[in-house]
């Protein structure tokens, strides 16, 4: 995660000073997605080559979903859900990686994490049937500090606190979460989940992708949606108990950990439903226009490609970051709005924003910029 300077495609959080807003306030700026135009005006092969260079995070998912959209554009390969094991594995490894990432200047993570990074690197290269066995071992030794099956049985705030206390010396995630500033536990209302099981979702996204401005600030008829682990596993008792108690940041972290732990009891990739990680969908929207989508580690990823006479005319990509950080009431935007009501110094507020970015897990560089110090 980069918190200094963001290029095209990056995410910017603006700080509005007290003389303008009456107190420090943060908001999310619409994301500049003009870099997607680099995929247009070239052949499909060249566009896919450029796509690989543009997206380093979840690169397999980006490429596979793009290929599915292109196949659908040519009237081939339309389906209501197929499981892609490589996308599934990439999603699990990416979830682990993002949870272990150190924050900028973060003194909290134990220094013994070098071996964890080495094991994670090896896990990301696994291509055999031992993947889930090695994944389970990594969860216990490097992430949770305890058997994932035991972690899955935790149901209450008290049991969560018990895990934090008992494992803060073994788990870098527990170590960081145990030190959460209580000021950051701002109560937020539950948001509707963005799931494929709602059949309206695909139709809505298809219509919404017709509007380029929507890509930078998506919403569903004014109602922004939750995506990622919290929308997929948000009904777990532990998540509900933490949320009901007002610990929204802890609930978000618990959902991410519970989802990972839920895969630990499998000997093979589990039977899939349409909202599972690694399940890809596609459909043809018109002559030369195809759309594909699927659940990745951070949430719903959608591609729409328009190809005419062998040349890519238009590419629209709606990524989880746009849903989560939507200026139009996305989960992170709501949290920032609530944070702005707190009377703290700018340094403390910045630290809290950086700390919470780790939970919301953007898939783009992040820059924090300041608005002019006067209304002029």
Where are these regions (language model features)?
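Mixed-charge (Asp/Glu-Lys/Arg
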Residues: 310
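Active-site bordering "gate/hinge" segments
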Residues: 1-298, 319-376
């Amino acid at each position: 995660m980069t918190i200094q300077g963001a290029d095209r495609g990056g995410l910017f959080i603006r700080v509005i000073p007290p003389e303008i807003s009456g107190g420090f306030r943060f908001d999310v700026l619409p994301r500049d997605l003009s870099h997607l135009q680099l995929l247009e005006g070239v052949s499909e092969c060249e566009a896919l080559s450029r796509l690989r260079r543009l997206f380093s995070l979840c690169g397999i998912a980006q490429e596979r979903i793009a290929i599915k959209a292109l196949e659908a554009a040519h009237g081939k390969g339309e389906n209501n859900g197929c499981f892609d094991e490589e996308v599934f594995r990439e999603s699990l490894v990416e979830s682990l990686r993002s949870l272990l990432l150190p924050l900028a200047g973060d003194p909290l993570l134990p220094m013994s994490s070098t071996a964890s990074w080495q094991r994670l690197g090896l896990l990301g290269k696994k291509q055999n049937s031992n993947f889930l066995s090695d994944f389970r071992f990594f969860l216990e030794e490097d992430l949770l500090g305890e058997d994932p099956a035991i972690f899955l049985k935790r149901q209450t705030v008290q049991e969560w606190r018990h895990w934090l206390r008992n494992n803060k010396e073994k788990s870098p995630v527990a170590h960081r979460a145990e030190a959460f500033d209580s000021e950051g536990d701002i109560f937020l209302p539950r948001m509707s989940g963005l799931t494929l099981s709602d059949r309206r979702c695909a139709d809505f996204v298809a219509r919404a992708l017709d509007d380029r401005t929507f890509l930078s600030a998506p919403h569903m008829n004014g109602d922004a949606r939750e995506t990622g682990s919290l929308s997929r596993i948000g009904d777990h008792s532990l998540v509900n108990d933490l949320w009901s108690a007002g610990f929204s940041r802890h609930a978000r972290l618990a959902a991410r950990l519970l989802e990972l732990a839920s895969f630990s009891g499998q000997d093979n990739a589990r039977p899939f439903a349409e909202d599972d990680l690694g399940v890809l969908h596609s459909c043809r929207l018109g002559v030369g226009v195809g759309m594909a989508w699927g659940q990745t580690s951070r949430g719903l990823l959608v591609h729409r490609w328009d190809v005419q006479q062998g040349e890519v005319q238009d590419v629209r990509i709606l990524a989880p970051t746009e849903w989560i950080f939507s200026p139009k009431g996305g989960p992170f935007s709501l949290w920032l709005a609530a944070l702005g009501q707190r009377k703290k110094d700018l340094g403390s507020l910045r630290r809290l924003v950086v700390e919470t970015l780790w939970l919301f897990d953007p898939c783009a560089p992040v820059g924090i910029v300041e608005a002019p110090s006067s209304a002029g």
